[in-house]
Amino acid sequence: MQRNWRELIKPKRLEVETKGLPNTYGKFECEPLERGFGITLGNALRRVLLSSLQGAAITSVKVDGVLHEFSTIPGVLEDVTDVILNLKEVRFKMHSDGPRLVVIEKDGEGEVAAGDIQGGPHVEVLNPEQHICTLEKDARLRMELTVKQGKGYLPADRNIEENQPIGTIPIDAIFSPIRKVSYTVTQARVAQITDYDKLTMEIWSDGSVKPDDALAYSAKILKDQLTIFINFEEEMETTEEEVRAEPVFNDHLFRSVDELELSVRSANCLKNADIRYIGELVQKTEAEMLKTKNFGRKSLNEIKEILTEMGLSLGMKLENFPSRDDIENRRKEQE
């Protein structure tokens, strides 16, 4: 039974690129995936990103002197419908739970922008440059806005509350903090096999949630929704690689035999025997060393004495000791 999922390849690499905009943009490359899983995961994550994450938006507006959305506001060039359309574009980040009432109060000629919203410590305006309306000379504007948290899209008729003040206009609310999501699937290579998938996702947010966090939340949502379909107890199984502890070797084993400061005769004997590293030397027995050309008892005793000082000896069994190439790569990394 477990072969159904244990034999599937799992993604091992996730690269993230933000182009210097970590709060609003993220590009994510994930590979390798089983063939077909790129579209499966990309489409599912995209739908969740756009529909299911919490955000904040204006749900109703009340303007002094205005009773309904088809009115005009004295001293304002735009009509109420245009003002509402502009208000829908204002993005917020809420620092506390519950609906919050924010206001706009401005007098005189000039532009009214989202930066004029007085939100206090609980409501942060993320795009203060967003245009709301234009005031004429001697105009006076006072506007109350209700900001709430939610997910997805909520039509105006669902933002009507009981006993709300006369003149309160409910508006459509787009809560989603994700502005855009795209994904592509290309080929990935594992060894000589080239028909795996690589999933590339690009996420643009309004800044209230970072794209990498948004992707993580979406994956968590999918995981929680799918759990109910698992009708068996999952056993924690350790793989053979996990059971077999990685051996720990004495650091001296990775040193060159040149560092032993042997006599010229002994050093030349090791060179002729193609022994470069101490780890290679200690795996030789005394009998094997004595068979080396020009290698005598004096050289043997010299080497044994130095190895003893290092806590080593000839004839050691070193299971899974790295190859010469691996040793050389390790030494290069440490340089």
Swiss-Prot record:
Domain note? The N-terminal domain is essential for RNAP assembly and basal transcription, whereas the C-terminal domain is involved in interaction with transcriptional regulators and with upstream promoter elements.
Keywords attached to this entry? DNA-directed RNA polymerase, Nucleotidyltransferase, Transcription, Transferase
Family the UniProt entry places it in: Belongs to the RNA polymerase alpha chain family.
Q: Name a GO CC annotation attached to this entry.
A: DNA-directed RNA polymerase complex
What's the protein name? DNA-directed RNA polymerase subunit alpha
Catalyses: RNA(n) + a ribonucleoside 5'-triphosphate = RNA(n+1) + diphosphate
Enzyme Commission number(s): 2.7.7.6
Q: Where is the region Alpha N-terminal domain (alpha-NTD)?
A: 1-233
BP-aspect Gene Ontology terms: DNA-templated transcription
